[in-house]
């Protein structure tokens, strides 16, 4: 049966939209490429897509330019230590493997009969001799050395991926380009136990809330312990009078100078006790200057006293960790004044408990600290803020990568120990969810940062456990972190039955999160809306758009069936998106 153009486009979009189906230490690669990145070969004859991989293929020598593929890539600095070419490839289905050659800058890394399997992709590594890799431009060639054959017929050799990396590197799927979740056949301990004598990557590992209620904190404490986390900080919005002023930005809810209601204090005292019961360090925090009609005055002792009373209350409960946040403010951005307030609160805390710790969230809390406004501000904190006070830092940007280079630069300027405030999987109370694994955090930043703290969803704290579990996995053992493995284990650890795990897998794939997209969308990014907009923006897409809506509707029905008493805000988010897509569909078609 011949398929019409419309059906072909529909199938292509359905494939794009609906396809779904023990970690070792893995250093960062020097370079990574898809097979399709190689020039030459037979990709101009037969395309580059095969079994979800971007491939290139070489045929026997008589095929001329189709018998070899080459890749040119730059190297700024050749690292010390042995390096290897890691290939993900497959052989043809002929009776024997074909002969190939692998050359780097003209020097042979391998020549002879390849040992890759026919029919399925496998990986092998080839040692790079000393001196073969050079600074500047390098050329890697993969050639078929068979003397007889023609294009389109065996013998042939097909490459899906190529990486230059140390021996222990493992070729893994690039989740930025191809995100889907494979549920593991085995439920493993999670995070995996560390080898004897090895300490966790980050000493302190946890999350904060996001305008959470006491009930939300209490619900998450056992999960933090389950995932080997040991730190929980209240969101300063939780200390606002949200019960009477739900619009926290209207300068009525932040009443830091007033006593907290007794009922609220009792609720948070229970949160502290539950943390202590589960081995979780509770960190108490406030932000007196955000959306505030009355900012704290460093020159008025009575003003500092009004702020101090809240910290004194918590210290009386046995709390040892405290936070003053001065992020996202528009007034009072004076590093000297901020340091003066923080130093005074810290002095009072240490006077009562020599083990008390304070973390200041500075107004400039992201980037490498070299900006025109950031650097003098941070240099003032370096001089005037007590050296024992930690600083929160969100990474290279408010949302995005966290690199060792930016960490070292920021730390050298601010002059203080750092605690990573990782802005993932936070949605800032916007109608979306970010459910994929945490990505793009350098594996060695734990060497210079003591603590890791995730930032969560607002209302959807139950589904937040899935991405938070991957954060816990990363923070526990960064060197062995595999996001594809981690997200699968996270799902099977929060759901009991195969049907429950499958529906959560599909929900995660629908809302993979802002970090999966390499452009690093903001916290309000909605993958469902974005996917649908791309579908209806393509030609011949009406059937695909209908299928996508139907898929999401079935997902909603399954979620309600499998979890009748859970994930209520999550269900509402999904249902609202479905209705929005239906409205867009009606307008377009």
Regions found by a protein language model. Name each.
Residues 7-19:
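Bacterial N-terminal signal peptides
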Residues 20-25:
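Boundary at the C-terminal end of the N-terminal hydrophobic targeting segment
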Residues 28-58, 62-66, 72-74, 80, ...:
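Beta-strand-rich ligand-recognition modules
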Residues 163-187:
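Low-complexity, Pro/Ser/Thr- and charge-rich linker/hinge segments at domain boundaries
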Residues 479-589:
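C-terminal functional modules
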């Amino acid at each position: 049966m011949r398929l019409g153009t419309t059906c072909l486009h529909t199938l292509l979009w359905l494939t794009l939209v609906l396809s779904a189906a023990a970690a070792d230490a893995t250093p960062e690669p020097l370079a990574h490429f898809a097979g399709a990145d190689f020039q030459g070969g037979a990709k101009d004859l037969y395309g580059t897509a095969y079994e979800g991989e971007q491939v290139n293929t070489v045929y026997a020598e008589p095929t001329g330019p189709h018998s070899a593929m080459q890749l040119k890539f730059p190297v700024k600095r050749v690292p010390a230590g042995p390096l290897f070419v890691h290939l993900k490839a497959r052989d043809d289905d002929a009776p024997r493997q074909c002969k190939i050659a692998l050359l780097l800058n003209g020097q042979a890394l391998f020549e002879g009969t390849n040992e890759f399997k026919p029919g399925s992709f496998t990986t092998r590594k080839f040692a790079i001799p000393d001196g073969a890799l050079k600074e500047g431009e390098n050329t890697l060639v993969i050639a078929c050395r068979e003397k007889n054959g023609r294009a389109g017929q065996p013998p042939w050799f097909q490459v899906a991926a190529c990486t230059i990396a140390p021996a222990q590197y493992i070729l893994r799927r690039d989740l930025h380009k191809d995100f889907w979740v494979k549920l593991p056949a085995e439920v493993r301990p999670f995070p995996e136990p560390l080898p004897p004598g090895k300490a966790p990557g980050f000493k302190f590992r946890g999350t904060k809330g996001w305008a959470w209620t006491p009930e939300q904190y209490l619900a998450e404490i056992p999960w933090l312990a389950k995932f080997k986390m040991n730190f929980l900080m209240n969101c300063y919005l939780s200390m606002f009078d949200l019960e009477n002023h739900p619009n926290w930005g209207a300068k009525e809810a932040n009443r830091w100078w007033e006593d907290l209601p007794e009922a609220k204090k009792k609720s948070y005292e229970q949160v502290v006790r539950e943390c202590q019961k589960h081995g979780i360090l509770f960190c108490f925090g406030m932000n007196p200057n955000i959306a505030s009609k009355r900012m704290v005055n460093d020159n008025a002792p009575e003003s500092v006293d009004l702020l101090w009373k809240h910290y004194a209350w918590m210290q009386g409960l046995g709390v040892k960790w405290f936070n003053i946040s001065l992020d996202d403010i528009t007034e009072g951005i004076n590093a000297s004044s901020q340091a003066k307030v923080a130093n005074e609160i810290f002095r009072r805390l240490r006077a009562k408990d020599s083990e008390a710790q304070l973390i200041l969230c500075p107004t400039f809390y992201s980037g490498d600290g070299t900006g025109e406004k950031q650097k003098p501000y941070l240099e003032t904190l370096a001089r005037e803020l007590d050296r024992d006070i930690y600083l929160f830092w969100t990474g290279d940007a408010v949302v995005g990568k966290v690199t060792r280079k930016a960490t070292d630069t920021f730390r050298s300027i601010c002059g203080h120990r750092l605690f990573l405030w990782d802005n993932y999987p936070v949605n800032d109370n916007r109608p979306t969810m970010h459910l994929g694994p945490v990505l793009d955090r350098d594996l060695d930043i734990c060497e210079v940062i003591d603590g890791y703290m995730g930032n969560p969803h607002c209302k959807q704290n139950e589904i937040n456990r899935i991405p938070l579990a991957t954060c816990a996995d990363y923070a526990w053992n960064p060197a062995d972190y595999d996001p594809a493995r981690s997200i699968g284990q996270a799902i099977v650890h929060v759901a009991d039955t195969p049907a429950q795990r499958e529906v959560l897998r599909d929900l995660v794939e629908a809302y993979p999160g802002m970090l999966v997209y390499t452009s690093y969308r903001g916290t309000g990014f909605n993958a469902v809306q974005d996917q649908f907009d791309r579908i209806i923006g393509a030609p011949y897409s009406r059937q695909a758009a209908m299928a996508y809506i139907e898929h999401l509707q079935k997902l909603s029905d399954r979620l309600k069936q499998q979890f009748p008493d859970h994930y209520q805000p999550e269900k509402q988010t999904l249902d609202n998106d479905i209705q929005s897509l239906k409205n867009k569909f009606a307008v377009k078609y």
